[in-house]
Regions:
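A short, polar/proline- and glycine-enriched secondary-structure boundary/capping micro-motif
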Residues: 95-96, 163-164, 206-210
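Gram-negative bacterial Sec-dependent N-terminal signal peptides
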Residues: 1-10
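Glycine- and aromatic-enriched membrane insertion/assembly motifs of diderm outer-membrane
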Residues: 56-116, 121-122
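Short loop/turn segments at connectors of secondary-structure elements within structured domains
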Residues: 112, 204-206
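Membrane-embedded beta-strand positions in outer-membrane beta-barrel channels/transporters
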Residues: 70-72, 101-103, 137-139, 181-185, ...
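Outer-membrane beta-barrel transmembrane domain signature
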Residues: 9-49, 53, 61-64, 128-194, ...
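Repeat-unit-sized solenoid/scaffold elements
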Residues: 82-92, 116, 182-190, 210-217
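Short hydrophobic/aromatic-rich motifs at helix boundaries and adjacent loops
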Residues: 1, 41-45, 73-76, 110-113, ...
């Protein structure tokens, strides 16, 4: 399953097109993809989760739906605090992206209910021929349960810095920006795993995410 996810992506990480709009789309969509964080339910007692999945643009970009793989791990170190991480790589065409990231999720709420979470996450995108990217994401979410479905709703901001490498393209030497978004996720239990879907919405574009979450212990 994990191999299929890592091999099924169709995103673009090169500047060969040369068009300024295309170059900025590559960088912005990459940063938006990296803003995704694992949906660790603070109301459960499980301490470790593994969450593979994929994210995709909701509209076509240069004739294609750009799709990216995801692989997150989360470890609750206390009742209120979890450490999250991304560490994986894959191959696509002439590129071999490497993703390395870590973050913290803090849970808070009423006396007996931790139904709010806030997170900070830094992720680096390396191993590319045309650029490297660093992103920092901050968000706040509210957990709501309805029957057998758990929802995570909130908003966040992604701050990114990109550095371009020299090559046969006209991309700027560096780019940086901020992407604000509204996020909604939904999880439901199916046998021994949680199945989830979510979306992050920005005025300029929307990205949808599908994932399977395994609670290890």
């Amino acid at each position: 399953m994990l191999t299929c996810i890592l091999d099924s992506q169709s995103a673009e990480f090169r500047f060969d097109n040369g068009d300024d709009g295309f170059v900025r789309s590559v960088v912005n969509r990459s940063a938006f993809w990296l803003s995704d964080s694992p949906a660790m339910n603070p109301t459960t007692s499980n301490r470790v989760i593994l969450q593979p999945g994929f994210s995709s643009s909701l509209t076509r970009l240069w004739g294609e739906y750009w799709t990216y793989p995801n692989l997150d791990i989360g470890i609750k170190v206390t009742r209120n605090l979890a450490v999250t991480g991304k560490l994986f790589g894959f191959s696509t065409g002439k590129e071999s992206p490497q993703i390395l990231g870590a973050g913290l999720q803090y849970y808070f709420g009423g006396t007996d209910t931790l139904d709010w979470s806030t997170s900070i996450q830094r992720v680096d995108l390396k191993g590319l021929n045309h650029f490297r990217l660093t992103s920092l994401t901050l968000d706040i979410r509210k957990w709501i349960s309805w029957k057998f479905i758990h929802f995570r709703l909130g908003m966040g901001s992604n701050f990114f810095k990109e550095v371009s490498y020299s090559g046969n393209h006209n991309a700027p030497a560096a780019m940086e920006g901020q992407i604000n978004f509204i996020g909604v996720d939904a999880l439901m239990r199916y046998t021994i795993v949680n199945i989830g879907a979510g979306t992050r919405i920005n005025p300029g574009w929307t990205m949808v995410t599908f994932f399977i979450q395994k609670e290890l212990f």
